[in-house]
Curated annotation (Swiss-Prot):
GO terms for biological process: homoserine metabolic process; methionine biosynthetic process. It is an enzyme of class 2 (transferase). The active site is at residues 145, 307, 340. GO terms for cellular component: cytoplasm. Homodimer. It comes from Listeria innocua serovar 6a (strain ATCC BAA-680 / CLIP 11262). Its EC number is 2.3.1.31. Keywords: Acyltransferase, Amino-acid biosynthesis, Cytoplasm, Methionine biosynthesis, Transferase. This is Homoserine O-acetyltransferase. One of its GO terms (molecular function) is homoserine O-acetyltransferase activity. The keyword Cytoplasm applies.
Amino acid sequence: MTLQQKELFQKSPLLLENGETLSPVLVGYETYGTLSASRDNCILLEHALTGTAHAAKHFEDDAPGWWDDYIGPGKTIDTDKYFLVCTNVFGGCSGTTGPSSINPKTGEPFRLQFPGFSIKDIIKVQRELLEQLGVTRIVSVIGGSMGGMQATEWAIDYADITDSIINIASPLAAGPDAIGYNLIMRMAILNDPDFNGGNYIGQPEGGLATARMVGMMTYRTSELFSKRFERFTVAESSPAAFSKEHFQIESYLQYQGDTFVERFDANSYLYLTKAIDLFDVTAPAKDDLPAFSKIKIPYLLIGITTDQLFRIHDLRRGYELLKEWDVPVTYHEVASEYGHDAFLVEKEVPKFEPLIRSFLNNLPVKSI
């Protein structure tokens, strides 16, 4: 079964953390496996910033998913055992309501009139979807990068129906360097003349492509770039004297930027990167305790030592904080020349798969 959509919050609007409301909300999602009669074998998979709900192939000739190596019969997320749900995030642009969606009040796209939202709001939409699908309990919420932030919020807001969390390469709060990179990327978009205050036709390609290129530099490592590109050049025809020599790394980054603008919306990029910046579960909640102190379920945290976006010292600090507050946390570190994106790379599956499989297999019996 490929992408499905369900309209939510039709009778009662979605109440966002900032007090704004929205109705209705369309959610795009994909499912794998079958929901059990007891409706308690669900795994919720969270995608990263520019991911989609298409986590794995549904059939042989289907388009590849972003986590094919982990999903399917007999694999880590065994679809003969689990009912897997993956949604496109609220505010995105691949099937779920976001800035490019039509505002029912105006008949025009929301664009920058779309309300601001948080990671907490993203999972609130997911919670409503799972309820509509008949899910009563979740074995685990799994996510990497921004997906790990969503998983952590699930442990805080919906621990009553969630049995465990797997967070890959995501801190308990976005660090200043990640916030800085996100600002640079947003400024590239905002300063593109074609952005037109968010009222663009097509995409502000130059700004969005530049944002993607900046992002790619944080998703990989200098070790990988040196090994792959060194100072190799490629043949390029350019009238500008300063660009007669074109390096392979330049060609690679330009390709990444050019292909990205074909599949992603600039306004969604602005909103989602800001939601990442604002994520901070170390901040005091209403009871003046850090929000993460509410986590009481098994929590697997995997840090990547070479991560250039969410630095390993932030993951280690998160682990120490979780331990201090008696969260049942298990922590592992993975070294990879692929850096932040290592959990998405086929070659690196042997480093992550045993950690995830072991964690799932050793959950309390009630969670299996």
